[in-house]
Design a protein with these regions (language model features):
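A cross-kingdom marker of C-terminal helix-rich interaction/assembly modules
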Residues: 1-50, 56, 60-61, 66, ...
Length: 185
């Protein structure tokens, strides 16, 4: 993935915030690769679950970059159960309120991304029975899942590089998102 190549081309300071977000981004890139492999293998349900993890990673990473205090960073490091609250997500959205790249993606993908973060019970409406029971995924839904996962990685990578003052590479990563169409499903 081009994003991984660009992000990995730099060395970063070893402060906790940077290490946390860089590690989160590395995990998201691995999840993204897994999503693509699962979809290529026809195993779409688990790809949805991994996409949910990628979305949560995006929100968490953007919040850490834009809103977390040093005390928050320390609490996150100490508390394995640390969760973002709706207020924290709102604060993160406010922090990026003037960022055109963030709001362009948010405008096109926010509704779809919100669908992927709901509890699994919501998926019951997509179950079918017959010769082979399971969740119903058409091509448009599969494309939307993989695109959402990709754009989350792209967005966090761009904002991480911007935070690290690698502005040229941040803009280069932002351009990768330009050709992705809006969601279909």
């Amino acid at each position: 993935m081009e994003v991984d190549r660009i992000v990995s081309s730099h060395t970063y300071p070893d402060d906790k915030r940077t290490v946390m977000v860089r590690g989160l981004l590395a995990a998201m890139i691995q999840y993204h690769r897994s999503v693509l492999l699962l979809v290529q293998s026809g195993i779409v349900g688990p790809a949805n679950s991994l996409t949910r993890n990628i979305i949560n990673g995006l929100r968490f990473g953007l919040w850490v970059i834009s809103c977390a205090t040093q005390e928050h960073v320390h609490r996150i490091e100490e508390d394995e159960e640390f969760q973002l609250t709706p207020e924290m997500i709102k604060d993160m959205h406010s922090a990026y309120s003037t960022d055109p790249f963030f709001y362009k993606l948010k405008g096109r993908w926010d509704t779809q991304i919100s669908k992927y973060t709901r509890e699994r019970i919501i998926e019951l409406g997509r179950w079918h029975t017959g010769l082979s029971a399971g969740l119903d995924f058409d091509e448009a839904k599969i494309r939307d899942v993989t695109t959402a996962a990709t754009l989350c990685v792209v967005l966090l990578a761009a904002k991480f590089l911007e935070y690290q003052k690698h502005l040229t590479d941040s803009k280069q990563i932002e351009t990768l998102a330009e050709d992705y169409p809006p969601p279909v499903s």
